[in-house]
Amino acid sequence: MQRAARPLVSVSDLDADKAAALKLIPIPSALEARLDAYVALLQQWQAKTNLVAPSTLPQLWTRHVADSLQLVSLMPHARRWLDFGSGGGFPGVVLACAMADVGGHVTLVERIAKKAAFLREALRVAGAPGTVVLADIGDNVDRFPQALDCITARAVAPLHQLIGFAEPLMTPGITKALFLKGQDVDAELTESTKYWKFQPKLHASLTGGQGWIVEIDHIERRT
């Protein structure tokens, strides 16, 4: 007799983590339903494709979903988003779920075909407005939208590289970048100033820990 696969994380643990996440960032029921569909799909795919670190699965809602959702409050009027290196969909798919009721759209850039396939399925299942571009972040800039409100990235590359990827896509006075970073943010900022002129604004993550969001709205290359 074939045994059913054991759940990657218990339902009770995930429900408790979801409750904690929604206490941090309350959301409408329609958005909650879309995120539920996305999280369920991610758990299915995680069994065969490494989309998030397995150790973080019990904190999927607080560690990943809420961490991504907080970007919306920093750019409440943004409708045209681009997410570099979307991977398992954080923050790209979460942002797309949030854009469904406000007429927004998210472009998700991913270089690994298997993950890009997951992202497309996640957008479909969640009913979220987005487009997946299978590409390396540093290449094919002409394939990305040229009119953007916000560029995001999470756990993809060092800050100075992300700034370089974002710079040709940013329209002064319109586009901002929001990069989610960890405990090494100060060192990454110092390294980035060797190559770029910019005035970052730091936001402490609502999810606690040592997370930070680096907000940038103007970039100049040092000569």
UniProtKB/Swiss-Prot annotation:
Keywords: Cytoplasm, Methyltransferase, rRNA processing, S-adenosyl-L-methionine, Transferase
SUPFAM superfamilies: S-adenosyl-L-methionine-dependent methyltransferases (SSF53335)
Gene Ontology CC annotation, any one: cytosol
One MF annotation (Gene Ontology) recorded for this entry: rRNA (guanine-N7-)-methyltransferase activity
Group of enzyme by EC: transferase
EC number: 2.1.1.170
Main subcellular location: cytoplasm
Subcellular localization, as worded in the UniProt entry: Cytoplasm
Domain of life: Bacteria
Binding site for S-adenosyl-L-methionine: 85, 90, 154
PANTHER family (UniProt xref): S-ADENOSYL-L-METHIONINE-DEPENDENT METHYLTRANSFERASES SUPERFAMILY PROTEIN
Summary of the function given for this chain in its UniProt record: Specifically methylates the N7 position of guanine in position 527 of 16S rRNA.
Family the entry assigns: Belongs to the methyltransferase superfamily. RNA methyltransferase RsmG family.
Protein name, entry field: Ribosomal RNA small subunit methyltransferase G
Native species: Rhodopseudomonas palustris (strain TIE-1)
Phylogenetic placement of the source organism: Bacteria, Pseudomonadati, Pseudomonadota, Alphaproteobacteria, Hyphomicrobiales
